[in-house]
């Protein structure tokens, strides 16, 4: 499975978990849709869920006039996924994670999602580079 596909499927699983309280294994199964699982996909889903509180804190810090629970579910899932990669997946360059998140926002978000995701992730990138 290509990494872009793994990210899309991880986004689908995380979105389902967020909006429907579906069990993690069930969301993973549904996102894979009978396709063979992939270690990168598994790392993304489980990593985001394991670090969700820290990721939400990182994201919330950069939401201007917004609260995390008020942004679109898909945008929240994209931000969590990208923030996880940026903060915890050391083998992936931060710019790659940002670009992939922007592509996900273009594909799955509304017209304003791309700029919003880019803005939040740019601020998270600055925080990571300063630490």
UniProtKB/Swiss-Prot annotation:
Keyword Transcription regulation appears in the UniProt entry: yes
Is the Transcription keyword given for this protein?
yes
One GO term in the molecular function aspect is: RNA binding
Tell me, which GO biological process terms does this entry list?
A: DNA-templated transcription termination; transcription antitermination
Q: Which UniProt keywords apply?
A: RNA-binding, Transcription, Transcription antitermination, Transcription regulation
List the record's Gene Ontology CC terms alphabetically.
cytosol
Q: Which residues form a coiled coil?
A: none
Q: Which InterPro entries match?
A: NusB-like_sf, NusB_fam, NusB_RsmB_TIM44
> Which Pfam family, just one, is annotated for this protein?
NusB
Please name the Gene3D superfamilies in this protein's record. Answer: NusB-like (1.10.940.10)
What is the protein's known function? Involved in transcription antitermination. Required for transcription of ribosomal RNA (rRNA) genes. Binds specifically to the boxA antiterminator sequence of the ribosomal RNA (rrn) operons.
Which PANTHER family is this protein grouped with? ANTITERMINATION NUSB DOMAIN-CONTAINING PROTEIN (PTHR11078:SF3), N UTILIZATION SUBSTANCE PROTEIN B-RELATED (PTHR11078)
The record's family statement is: Belongs to the NusB family.
Q: Please name the HAMAP family in this protein's record.
A: NusB
What's the name of the protein? Transcription antitermination protein NusB
**Gene source species:** Bacillus subtilis (strain 168)
């Amino acid at each position: 499975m290509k990494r872009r596909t793994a990210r899309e499927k991880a986004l689908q699983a995380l979105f389902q978990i967020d909006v429907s309280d579906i069990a993690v294994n069930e969301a993973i199964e549904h996102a894979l849709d009978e396709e063979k699982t992939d270690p990168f996909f598994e790392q993304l889903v489980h990593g985001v869920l394991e670090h969700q509180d820290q990721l939400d804190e990182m994201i919330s810090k950069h939401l201007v006039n917004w609260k995390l629970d008020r942004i679109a579910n898909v945008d929240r899932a994209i931000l969590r996924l990208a923030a996880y990669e940026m903060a915890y997946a050391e083998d992936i360059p931060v710019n790659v994670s940002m670009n992939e998140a922007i592509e996900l926002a273009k594909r799955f978000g509304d017209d304003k999602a791309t700029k919003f995701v880019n803005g939040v992730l740019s601020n998270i990138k600055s925080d990571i580079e300063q630490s």
